[in-house]
Amino acid sequence: MKIALCQINPTVGNFNAIRESITRYYKKAIDQGAGLVVFPEMVTTGYPPQDLLWDNGFINKNLNLVESIAKNSSVPIIFGFVRSVDNKLFNSAALCSKGLHHGTYDKILLPTYDVFDEDR
């Protein structure tokens, strides 16, 4: 199996540009024969989103992008996003293919040192 690792540098909160970049790299990977396409953690928001996570609509825009990626998927794709459950935020990874979001994995060990503030 050919696995494509798409290391992109999304601008935090620029959801339209992030969508375009993911779409472009995903299509390119498929065209080059990838059987699985992988993007970085929190690619749907950019990293680190910091206090933008608490801005009205930020999480929903991120989740709308997750739905769009899933809907337009064919070859399996794994990518990072932020999800909210009972007002608790998770740094998560989604697995999507054939137009469906098949599963989610939540990061367990969050860094809380130096420039990282994922514990908040």
Q: Which positions does each model-derived feature cover?
A:
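Enzyme catalytic cores with a strong preference for nitrogen-chemistry domains
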Residues: M1-R120
